[in-house]
């Protein structure tokens, strides 16, 4: 492995890989620096940190999500003590894993190792992913398990190894129910395997992992933890979520607003004595964010073109078999488009309150598509693709103060809020903060 890495640094892509490594190190540094600051709870952390501690105290969980995310937060608290660093350690670690997962899935889509470095670099310098690596919240961990499930399924060579993907997806559902939408994605991958039916059958293990984690949480809370108790609690939480249709919070946004986005979340805003402030916004790297939209259009367009050509040649059957078998770049992009769509589809048909953070698992797969597009561009436009990656890195460096909570003036913050509606997401506390 070391030899292959050194060879890659002597290859024509060496400058790009070197730049990507710098961006990755920089992004991990932004996630890690002053992770314990502030020492109090910030945006939404009270929902999960306080209930993580109730598990450790063997008291009932009053939060409206399944237990696993809070159990992951509780483990470092149990090992290291009740500190702000311990609260945020699990999201930080899984947030760093997200960087690797984006790169690995991008390498599978593009069938090029260079795509790994590009994907990891793009994920590393994106503020949306950074913010959920620096906060004791569930969505970054949810994205991690969803991507891990998809990657494990893609790499599985037999049904026992595919079973691990099913268990990972069931575990993701034990963080948030919304992960269940990835079942069709894993089913598509299963049908592409040589032993398709046996592999697809392992998806029944997804529900097996979910009650296991839920029972563990109920047991720790000294509550009934049998199958009937899990079913009753699941039903209660589902009905609670289904009733959240008030649309009163000022930071709520519809799914079609996420493409800009219109309401990024203001995670933290701590004033300093010299008039500056330390800010953490969930606004991503604007260039990456909008490139996700373009990459999606490109991927969907390539699917439409392939479909039209297949119809003209009267070769729809073979084209369908290639798509189901994930043969070729168009089919692989189609799978990632499906993975992007899966977390968003429920919001198309639901009137439930929604925030931009519900977009995070889909967004991660969107970054994969951007990396694959970069990898394709490298084949013909190596210099242009390299310059484009440098520009993305420069934009990330420009926005780094509002992702890494470095001291910055109010004017500096507002300069980074390119759109007037972003000002709230960058500078003001939500009136609903604790």
Where on the chain are the PLM-derived regions?
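Aromatic-rich transmembrane-lumenal/periplasmic boundary elements in polytopic membrane proteins
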Residues: 38-51, 206-263, 407-424
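Short helix- or helix-capping micro-motifs
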Residues: 23-30, 119-124, 131, 151, ...
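Extracytoplasmic catalytic/substrate-binding loops of multi-pass membrane glycan-assembly enzymes
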Residues: 37-50, 60-72, 82-85, 225-228
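Transmembrane-helix motifs of polytopic, lipid-linked glycan transferases
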Residues: 25, 85, 89-110, 148, ...
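Membrane-interface transmembrane helices that cradle and orient dolichyl/undecaprenyl
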Residues: 107-110, 149-163, 190-191
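Short acidic/glycine- and proline-prone juxtamembrane loop motifs at membrane-interface regions
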Residues: 42-43, 91, 128-141
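Transmembrane helical bundles and short interhelical boundary loops of multi-pass, membrane-embedded
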Residues: 202, 206, 210-211, 219-221, ...
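Transmembrane-embedded, aromatic-rich helix segments that form part
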Residues: 143, 163-166, 178-192
């Amino acid at each position: 492995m070391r030899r292959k890495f050194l060879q890659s640094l002597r290859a024509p892509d060496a400058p790009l890989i070197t730049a990507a490594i710098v961006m990755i190190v920089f992004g991990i540094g932004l996630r890690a620096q002053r992770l314990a600051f502030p020492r109090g709870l910030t945006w939404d952390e009270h929902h999960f940190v306080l209930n993580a501690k109730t598990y450790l105290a063997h008291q009932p969980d009053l939060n409206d999500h399944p237990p696993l995310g809070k159990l992951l937060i509780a483990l470092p608290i149990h090992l290291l003590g009740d500190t702000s660093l311990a609260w945020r350690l699990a999201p930080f670690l899984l947030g760093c894993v997200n960087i690797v997962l984006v790169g690995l899935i991008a390498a599978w889509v593009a069938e090029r190792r260079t795509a790994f470095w590009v994907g990891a670099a793009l994920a590393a310098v994106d503020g949306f992913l950074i913010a959920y690596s620096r906060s004791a919240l569930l969505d970054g961990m949810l994205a991690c398990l969803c991507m891990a499930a998809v990657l494990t399924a893609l790499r599985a060579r037999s049904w026992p190894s595919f079973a691990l993907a099913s268990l990972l997806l069931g575990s993701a559902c034990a963080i948030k129910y919304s992960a269940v939408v990835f079942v069709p994605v894993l089913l598509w991958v299963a049908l592409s395997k040589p032993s398709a039916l046996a592999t697809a059958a392992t998806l029944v293990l997804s529900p097996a992992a979910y009650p296991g984690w839920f029972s563990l949480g109920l047991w720790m809370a000294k509550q009934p933890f049998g199958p009937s108790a899990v079913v009753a609690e699941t039903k209660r939480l589902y009905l609670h979520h289904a009733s959240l249709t008030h649309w009163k919070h000022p930071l709520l946004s519809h799914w079609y607003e996420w493409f800009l986005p219109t309401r990024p979340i203001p995670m933290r805003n701590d004033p300093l004595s010299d008039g500056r402030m330390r800010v953490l916004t969930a606004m991503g790297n604007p260039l990456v964010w909008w490139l996700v939209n373009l990459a999606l259009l490109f991927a969907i367009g390539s699917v439409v073109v392939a479909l039209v050509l297949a119809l003209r040649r009267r070769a729809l059957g073979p084209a369908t078999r290639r798509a189901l078998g994930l043969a070729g770049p168009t089919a692989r992009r189609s799978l990632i488009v499906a993975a992007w769509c899966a977390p968003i589809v429920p919001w198309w048909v639901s009137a439930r309150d929604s925030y931009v953070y519900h977009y995070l698992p889909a967004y991660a797969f969107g970054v994969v598509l951007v990396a694959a597009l970069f990898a394709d561009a490298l084949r013909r436009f190596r210099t242009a693709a390299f310059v484009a990656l440098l520009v993305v890195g420069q934009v990330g460096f420009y926005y780094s103060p509002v992702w890494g909570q470095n001291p910055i003036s109010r004017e500096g913050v507002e300069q980074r809020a390119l759109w007037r509606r972003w000002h709230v997401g960058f500078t003001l506390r939500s009136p609903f903060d604790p």
